[in-house]
Structure formats: structure tokens, C-alpha cells
């Protein structure tokens, strides 16, 4: 759920004036691997790759270097060798999965009302991504203390996010059912992106382990009845689908997400590719509700190969 203005002042003051430029710069940097001269040796490319790696992470709203991972027994919030770290540790697929999650989340009228009433995503389009990335980093790779602090901060913010949706129903970010929706939409998209565009195959039992590990975070935020297996996730979506539908607020937010803020033709091409990759992993029933065609042949022949190549190039660039 979004954060109210009072809770975002320190963060937003640092980036509100240049958010559009940062997103454009990110698009330029993301396409850099395709433009790098292949004739250069690995040693000659190393300094360039290190600079691009730091710049890409800053432009995406995450720290210039990956977070320090808590490894000592009893210290990490989530298991060091677990599936959450494996999925969340692959930034290229997480970028695609994050966009897919935002698109999917627009279909819940109460969640969307909270975004429309309390978020400044139009003025600071990268702000929510940055805050989400910091939260995911702290809860996935941080210590118990770091994760607990991040969770308590979010819970405090949620206490102030409440209101009434256009249909007259009241909403609150602390509502356990809304928290479950946001969580399931998010982690299912992260996993779908990892399976489609990630560096390695994920087994069925590993899917369940991923949902079990991330459910700990959701319950810590106040969510209830959190799915812990792929079967439970699919059953959850089947149960909640009657509550999901499109509306003016959802359409406005989705248009913003699909359009982006890229200016130059090359930047737009890159962003269109990311959008196409994200839409390819949005469930078909959700795309039908959004009125966005889901041609599997085009996805399989054009979108998926491009996205895999793109993620592979970015993964090479970001490798320490």
C-alpha cells in the first residue's frame, strides 16, 4: 500500500525534482549492454561494467551496491540459502516482476483507491519502486533487527492510509485481506518473472519453499490466510477474482505504467520491451479484465526471447 506524504518527506525531497530524468537515465543504462562494443576484452570492459552497475542500481532506486547479506546462524530474517534470496537476488527479473505486480494490483478497487488517494506516483514515479526495493532488500537479505525495523516502519505508515473508495466502501492499508492481496500479487509476479526470465530453472518444490519463506514477511505486516504453496496461490486467485475489476482509477494508473516517461526513441524501445515482458507474465484472466490481449504466440516468439536476452545482458552488467 502507498505511504502518506508526511511519511515520505525525507525520501521524496531527494528525488522529486529529478524523478523523470532518473527513469530516463535508467532506460539508457539498461540498454547499454546491447551497445557495448563486443570486440573489447573482459578486462577492458570491467571498469565500464562497474560504473554501469552502480548507475543502474541508483537509477532504479536501489543502493549503488547490493545490500550486505546477513549470514550468521540465527541472525538473518530469512534463510541465507533460501528461495527468497535466490528469486529476489536477480535484479533483472525483479524489475520485470515488479512492473507486472503493479499492473496486477490495479485490479483491486480498494487497493487502487488507496494508491489514488495517498500516492504521488505521477510526480515521483520511481519513489514507490525505491521504497519497495529497500523493504524487499531489508526483509530478504537483512538481519532480524533490520527486517523488524523495516516492517514496523511500514506498519506505522499503514495506520495513516485509510479512506473511502469511489464505490463508497471504506479501505485501510492495515486491512489483513488487502495486505494479503498486495503480497500475493507481488510475490507471484516475482516468481513468474524468475521462472520465465531468471538464470536457472525453478522446481515445483522450490516454488512452494519461496511462498513459505515470503509468507513470514506478509504475516509480520499483519496479513492473514497467506498462501504458502503454488496450489494455494492459484486457489486464492480463484477465490478473489469476483472482487477484482477495472475502473477509472485503475485505468489511469495502468496507462501511466504502460506509457512510462521515456523520451527518446531508443529509451521508448527499451521500456516497451520491459512492459511487454511484464505483460507476458500477468495472468491471462487479469489481462482479459484489463482489456489487454494476451496472444501466446507473439509472447513466445517475440517477447520472451527479447526479455531473456535483455535480462541476460543486464545480469552480466550487474555481476560484481
Predicted features, each with a name:
Residues 2-181, 185-320:
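Mature, function-bearing regions of proteins
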Amino acid at each position: 500500500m502507498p505511504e502518506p506524504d508526511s511519511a515520505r518527506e525525507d525520501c521524496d525531497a531527494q528525488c522529486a525534482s529529478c524523478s523523470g530524468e532518473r527513469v530516463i537515465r535508467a532506460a539508457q543504462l539498461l540498454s547499454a549492454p546491447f551497445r557495448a562494443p563486443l570486440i573489447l576484452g573482459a578486462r577492458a570492459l570491467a571498469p565500464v561494467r562497474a560504473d554501469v552497475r552502480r548507475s543502474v542500481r541508483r537509477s532504479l532506486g536501489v543502493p549503488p551496491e547490493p545490500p550486505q547479506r546477513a549470514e550468521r546462524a540465527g541472525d538473518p530474517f530469512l534463510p541465507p540459502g533460501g528461495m527468497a534470496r535466490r528469486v529476489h537476488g536477480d535484479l533483472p527479473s525483479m524489475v520485470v516482476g515488479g512492473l507486472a505486480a503493479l499492473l496486477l494490483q490495479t485490479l483491486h478497487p480498494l487497493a487502487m483507491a488507496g494508491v489514488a488517494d495517498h500516492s504521488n506516483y505521477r510526480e515521483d514515479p520511481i519513489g514507490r519502486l525505491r521504497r519497495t526495493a529497500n523493504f524487499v532488500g531489508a526483509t530478504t537479505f537483512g538481519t532480524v533487527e533490520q527486517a523488524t525495523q523495516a516492517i514496523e516502519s511500514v506498519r506505522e505508515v499503514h495506520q495513516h492510509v485509510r479512506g473511502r473508495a469511489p464505490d463508497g466502501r471504506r479501505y485501510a492499508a492495515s486491512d489483513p485481506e488487502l495486505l494479503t492481496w498486495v503480497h500475493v500479487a507481488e510475490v507471484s509476479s516475482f516468481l513468474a518473472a524468475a521462472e520465465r526470465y531468471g538464470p536457472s530453472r525453478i522446481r515445483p518444490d522450490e516454488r512452494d519453499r519461496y511462498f513459505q519463506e515470503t509468507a513470514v514477511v506478509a504475516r509480520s505486516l499483519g496479513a492473514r490466510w497467506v498462501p504458502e504453496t503454488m496450489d494455494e496461490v492459484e486457489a486464492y486467485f480463484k477465490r478473489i477474482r469476483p472482487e477484482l475489476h477495472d475502473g477509472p482509477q485503475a485505468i489511469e494508473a495502468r496507462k501511466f505504467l504502460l506509457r512510462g516517461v521515456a523520451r527518446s526513441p531508443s529509451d521508448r524501445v527499451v521500456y516497451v520491451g520491459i512492459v511487454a515482458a511484464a505483460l507476458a507474465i500477468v495472468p491471462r484472466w487479469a489481462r482479459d479484465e484489463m482489456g489487454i490481449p494476451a496472444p501466446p504466440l507473439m509472447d513466445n516468439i517475440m517477447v520472451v526471447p527479447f526479455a531473456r536476452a535483455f535480462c541476460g545482458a543486464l545480469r552480466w552488467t550487474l555481476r560484481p
